């Protein structure tokens, strides 16, 4: 039997008509691990591994989508994944899947080679990054989300104590809708500069002295942290909207302190 002969063509069940007349808002593949490259702030490329979610809108009369085409899209993609490249990838997906709406999300670890503040020793620090692209009603939107670990030191603890103050590791999460390409490191830098102190992968004793004193001289409540980062995001014209979170893993409690600011600059809110 020659399966390539039209006389023996294999049936394509997914392309048949569905009589239930129920559209599906999102259908596709999730948790696909696939390599990618991203561009650093210095213009170089960094190789990493992404966990991808891809989906499209399915009309009411169509039984199924073309599942294999999602993975084929990842296989064909090349070059660093910038905001512009992400928009192109979204358009290509809609064309391949014959869809009018769709969404791509990829999460990956991103590494920054940081220099210790006193000794100058260099070490890598990892950050969690998620890029999301969404096409709906003819509008394409691209989001960059990054989780930045930092140090926070309590102003109240410092004020009431004769010496010392409680401090802890904190997470600043910036989820920004982009009007233009924004390097991941720009968002990281904003969060780190507004914290009591940033983190490093490797520190020598002179560096530990520096970060201890730096945090002590720059105390911040979780409210201070989220407001100071928000002020920086407000001033950045490349960002049109954001959801900003700060969470302090309190060293003197068994719970966290948390704050959130959400703003869409297009609405002036």
From Swiss-Prot:
Physiological role: Converts GTP to 7,8-dihydroneopterin triphosphate.
EC number, UniProt record: 3.5.4.16
Keywords: Hydrolase
Class in the EC hierarchy, top level: hydrolase
Any one GO molecular function term: GTP cyclohydrolase I activity
May be catalytically important, annotated site positions: 154
GO BP, sorted A to Z: tetrahydrofolate biosynthetic process
Catalytic activity: GTP + H2O = 7,8-dihydroneopterin 3'-triphosphate + formate + H(+)
S-S bonds: none
Gene that encodes the chain: folE2
UniProt pathway annotation: Cofactor biosynthesis; 7,8-dihydroneopterin triphosphate biosynthesis; 7,8-dihydroneopterin triphosphate from GTP: step 1/1
Protein's UniProt name: GTP cyclohydrolase FolE2
HAMAP family with a match to the protein in the record: GTP_cyclohydrol_B (MF_01527_B)
